[in-house]
Amino acid sequence: MKQKLSIILILGLVIFIIVKNNNFRKTYLEESDTVGVYINNELSDKIPSKDEATFYKAICDDKNVSVSWDNESWGLLLKNLTKKAKCNLYFYQGDTVFNFDYTGSEQTFTAPVSGIYKLETWGAQGGSYSNEYYGGYGGYSKGEINLLEKQTVNIVVGGSGESESSKLSQGGYNGGGNGDYQRGFEDKRFFGSGGGATHVSTKIGLLSELTNYKNSILIVSGGGGGSFYDGPNSTSACGGAGGGFKGKEGFVTNNGWGTAGYGGTQNNAGYSICDENTCNATNNPLEKKIYGEGSFGLGGTNAVSASSGGGSGFYGGGASVHVQSGGGGSSYIGNPLLTNKVMYCYNCEESNEESTKTISTTCSEETPTENCAKKGNGYARITLVSIGE
């Protein structure tokens, strides 16, 4: 009859505790092939210390053996072990946090080990004239996903917008809408461009290139709309914030000259409009119609009149009609593979639905900060939360 044994393994020392008549007797294991140690799937001659690696699984060839790991004491408890049983311990040694700053190009991440990873993205800010008249802040999104070892995902970090008075304001990388200057008002009126979105996907490409591959998109953070500064009249406006299930509308400061850009949503892009009610200023020559409509992955650009650009996003925000600011782009956490997910945006509308959960925040930081809107360029971070078997 086989004896029922318990074994504790602490930093390479194996101790048998044999239970008989409620008395304990310690015996040291001499067989060197009973326990194997693997670090990053390579055989090792020693167990790494707690600060060197992360334990993630133990496999025994005898199904009757019960295995558990005590991370606090850094020890393994095996029950019902026999001398013929062989158990292998597996450890991961390497980075657990992976940061992706703005580079103006696509980046990739390859999972070093199978497990649950936390995805965090920050969209980019729209073009700012000053700290007082600033472009809309980029949104923040987070969620968790299960990735397999060596599985690769694509990361695109959005670039911030510009603010110009005598030339085109180029939209931020990854879809920010352009801002266009007003002839005759050079160095007086400044129009900002939209900030770019930041996204993580399983397919390579800028966000706008994934229109027919939406299932590949894991997470998105929208960029902010461009600001507007009007020196002669002191009628200036900040851009609409990006992020959340619906990007924030820009600000109207010149009544009678159209609307600011509306924010993008989960299904439609933002735009601005000139009609009998919004374009009723004397001598307003603008045609009554919709202007500056964004699209999937692109902030709006108004090619007809001087305007501020819309922020990029799952759906981009609209560019303004003339002398107003641009709208923010929307974020996205709707992929069913994503869990524990939420979006944050600056002073925005909230949602409690799981696939569009949005929380409004008054936090905005240059440094990428959890649950905070983003100033400047976007950012992305991937963190290994737990290792799978």
Locations of regions flagged by a protein language model:
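Ser/Thr/Pro/Gly-rich low-complexity linker/stalk segments immediately outside membranes or between
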Residues: 23-36
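Short strand-edge motifs at loop-to-beta-strand transitions and within beta-strands
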Residues: 74-76, 107, 139-143
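Short, structured beta-strand segments at or near domain termini in extracellular proteins/domains
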Residues: 88-91, 198, 220, 374-388
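Extracellular and analogous surface-interaction loops
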Residues: 101, 106-117, 143-151, 200-208, ...
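Secretome/extracellular-domain signature
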Residues: 135-258
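Extracellular low-complexity, Gly/Ser/Thr-rich intrinsically disordered linkers
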Residues: 291-387
